[in-house]
């Protein structure tokens, strides 16, 4: 093999092509406004937006956390308050039930909405593969701006500006997906005991191993399907 061909193959192996991302003047203007601040905050914590990003939501706290990979593990970057979600605790199962999903989701570049009726938005990927297997219905479930929603997670315009920009910049670096895990609460025994009478308890217990793996290793658990339920591995 010639040195030229070897060099070309090596460059293709080492460098991911940049994603073709949906964009708008609004999203560009937002990036100009908020990215310098976010970049300074990332650098101050020794983090790089080119590294993998992980998102997780806790409904009962109305909070979204953003974690960024640093070495082998992920490090907490910052959190954002959720202004509104509908339906309380418990996951979405059908279109029109007014519930906001709980589970393990994947966001890809194609799921960005740079110009939305809710300012900026990203589709969370509901229903996921397990939910499709169970026949759950509904679509267009978003994390978006404003402070009103049915089935989505409304972060305010100020909040979504930063969240959307971080996600966009991560995809711009060549990343192909971002994991979003949505929990009803922190899955410790205290909370599970508090909700022992809930009809959702079996489902929540099925989510707990994924939560526990991240708490132990600070590496997002990979959710697979086994016996019509979640199965986890790192």
Language model feature labels by segment:
Residues 1-3, 7-23:
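Bacterial Sec-dependent signal peptides at the C-terminal "C-region" and cleavage site
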Residues 18-150, 158-178, 187-234:
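Cell wall/extracellular polymer interaction/catalysis modules
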Residues 155:
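A conserved hydrophobic position in a structured secondary element of the catalytic/binding core
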